[in-house]
Amino acid sequence: IVAASTSSSAVRGSTFNIIFLDEFAYVPNNIAEEFFSSVYPTVSSGKSSKVMIVSTPHGMNMFYKMWVDAENKRNDYVPIEVHWSEVPGRDEKWKEETIRNTSEGQFQTEFECEFLGSVDTLISASKLKTMAVESPKRSGGLDVYNMPEKDHIYTMAVDVSRGLSYDYSAFVVFDCTKAPYKVVAKYRDNEIKPLLFPSIIERVAKHYNKAFVLIEINDLGQQVADNLQFEIEYDNVMMCTQRGRSGQVLGGGFSGRGNQLGLRMTKGTKRIGTSNLKSLIEGDKLIITDFDIIAELSTFISKGKSWEADSGSTDDLVMCCVIFGWLANQSYFKELTDVDVRGQMFTEQQNAIEADMA
């Protein structure tokens, strides 16, 4: 019998018949993934080996995904839920007293077993609950939900990291042919180096009908954008123009004064991107079925006058979506796709008001 804290190397090199994981939902996502990568060969090698996972929910993480997959019979785990009302002596009076001494949110998580994310999230909790997760077709780190279709228009939003383990380089591919838009593929890797990232971007973008690519160029993003455009010679890298106090606008890809490859993320562009992303998702104009994006959205919270990942969480995929939110608000993008989502949403809202007044 061995007792150990959960880490990537906790049981490596050992053989166990039963592995019991307590409060697994509270293990950080990156450690949980590394732990299962090392422990599963140990478990699968024995005919009678078992894994038991016991935990109260803690947002949308690896435990949440395993639980949902078990409920939908997408894995071989057996889900067992113990509700507070099944414990003798606990009734509505006990519930009211407990909420009074803690909080509604704590009670929902600890006793109702609700998978709540962080508070003050960009996307409302009620909307996050209704966002359905689909299983992707996996291929070398790229999660694919829809294969490219002829004559469809695709855009790719790219967020670049330094290639260190705590940060991910990521991109998300969107089908922009018509509203609602849809996430059709996503990639993220916390070890890919900026020198190699442009080759992966180019390969996937070409596959998706030579997708238009918009790269966030803060820090090492500029290097990735330059390599993609000038060394690999990928033509559909989007450019932005600086318009003084008006900020950046999406351009047509012609070089000139004030033009730059990619988007520089500033307070202004982030404010527009987050606001538009919220409108798109909550207005059902952007369909996201990727678990990792939804999980990041559940911990993407308000901090001061901005939005960022909650402590211990990441937001690389969400920032790709924020880039797309900014992009979808640009006049040049509407010309490329011939889809004015803001106009559609305004018309639908007006029709709803008129219907209520009728």
Where are these regions (language model features)?
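Catalytic acidic motif of RecA-like/P-loop NTPases
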Residues: 25-26, 162, 219
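Acidic two-metal-ion nuclease catalytic site recognized across multiple nuclease folds
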Residues: 186, 324-358
